[in-house]
Amino acid sequence: IAEKHHLHKPVTEQSQYNLFERKKVEREYSRLWADYRYGNTIWSPLASGLLTGKYKDGIPDDSRGALKGYEWLQDRFTNQAEVAKVENLRPIADRFGCTLAQLALAWATKHPMVSSVITGASRVSQVVQNFEALGVIPLITDEVDEEMRAIVKG
């Protein structure tokens, strides 16, 4: 369509992608990658913070989930089944000597259809932690990927 109308062709897609939200990247857009070599810039790799593990004991007062206007996220943060799945990922993070956030970021970054990752941070320490996830990427083998997927599926 772009060529027909002498327009610039798209070169990337921006999709939500994390352990809980995989359908668009892994199924719906897989042909864009395979057929056209589109890139994919993903957002919400930490599932709005759920994959950090900080919601295991409820919604902390200093978190996004406690902010006015973010009430729509509270159901997700208090969903005990999802919180339990995140906690079941903790032994993998412990095995690698990393945080849950670093594990989730490394997992998302490792996917071959992911070109870049949009991260968010409200503290400098979170930015540093995000960068440290780069060292975890090589640890996400096919076996680890399968283990993580089985945990969040179950």
Regions found by a protein language model. Give the residues of each.
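Beta/alpha (TIM)-barrel catalytic core signal, keyed to glycine-rich beta->alpha loops juxtaposed to Asp/Glu
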Residues: I1-V152
